Amino acid sequence: VPNAQPALEGRTSFPEDTVVTYKCEESFMKIPGKKDSVICLKGSQWSDIEEFCNRSCEVPTRLNFASLKQPYITQNYFPVGTTVEYVCRPGYRRELSLSTKLTCLQNLTWSTAVEFCKKKSCPNPGEIRNGQIDVSNGILFGATISFSCNTGYKLFGPTSSLCLISGSSVQWSDPLPECREIYCPAPPQIDNGIIQGKRDHYGYRQSITYACNKGYTMIGEHSIYCTVNDDEGEWSGPPPECRGKSLTSKVPPTVQKPTTVNVPTTEVSPTSQKTTTKTTTPNAQATRSTPVSRTTKHFHETTPNKGSGTTSGTTSLLSGHKCFTLTGLLGTLVTMGLLT
């Protein structure tokens, strides 16, 4: 049999009624409707068989955008010159200017398939208030669009939608989401102060201003604003503090009290005056004369004990200066720390 080989399966003898089947050689296909086997008849004769193998193209190429029409789906014999026809798959539309047919060529290959079916387009997705739609992948069949919200808003609903087949057309798999404004919690209150311009809600970038009550000083920022972190509202920082003014305490000046000073002193003797070293004692009291009607007062020196090198502090300081005004005296005593 031309272009075919019998499948003997190792047999060398063929008794009467033995059936032998043939198989087409490579690049040949069995012609539909023709027998591919013979039988051993009486008298050791084989039954007649016609040529049943012929050159044929392989099963037509599978196309992503189209499928074979019904008569060609189960066919496996495609001799040279055979033409097959396609139909657009769901989700695609026909390009009327292009042919939907392919032909088996002499080299047993199919003619090149042009894209005679184009993807259908989903409807315009529209807009999201306070949000964005990413359509960088297009809106044709099989495309995915994604949704996002502007800063300060939170997305409620699907984050994406796919263009899918819906009946004889295509539609989006999910509706548009909603972008809702994010609010910060109620602003923190402060002691001894107020919040100026309070409102019911505080959205993204909205601020509040603090003010201190009279007599208090603000420590920190006067204003804070609403910001967003992981789709949750939070304040930009802590509130300020209102602190009372501190009263300055009166601290007496530090006075260095000398232990030994050199002052001029006059002895009771009417004819001599000399300088001696006197040691001051802060707790000693000065002896003064009876005050007169004016503010000038006279003080008299107390003669020290013989053999002693010290006198009372007041006496030693006033020695040689017989007259002091009351104001000057008081100032001296304050400086010495004897009066406060």
Curated annotation (Swiss-Prot):
The keyword NAD does not apply. It is found in: Cell membrane. Residues 235-317 are annotated as: Disordered. Residues 269-287, 307-317 have a biased composition (Low complexity). Residues 246-268 have a biased composition (Polar residues). One of its GO terms (cellular component) is side of membrane. InterPro entries: Compl-Cell_Adhes-Reg, Sushi/SCR/CCP_sf, Sushi_SCR_CCP_dom. The Ser/Thr-rich domain is heavily O-glycosylated. GO terms for biological process: complement activation, classical pathway; innate immune response; negative regulation of complement activation. Its main location: membrane. This protein recognizes C4b and C3b fragments that condense with cell-surface hydroxyl or amino groups when nascent C4b and C3b are locally generated during C4 and c3 activation. Interaction of daf with cell-associated C4b and C3b polypeptides interferes with their ability to catalyze the conversion of C2 and factor B to enzymatically active C2a and Bb and thereby prevents the formation of C4b2a and C3bBb, the amplification convertases of the complement cascade. Belongs to the receptors of complement activation (RCA) family. Monomer (major form) and non-disulfide-linked, covalent homodimer (minor form). Interacts with ADGRE5. This is Complement decay-accelerating factor. It comes from Pongo pygmaeus. The gene is CD55.
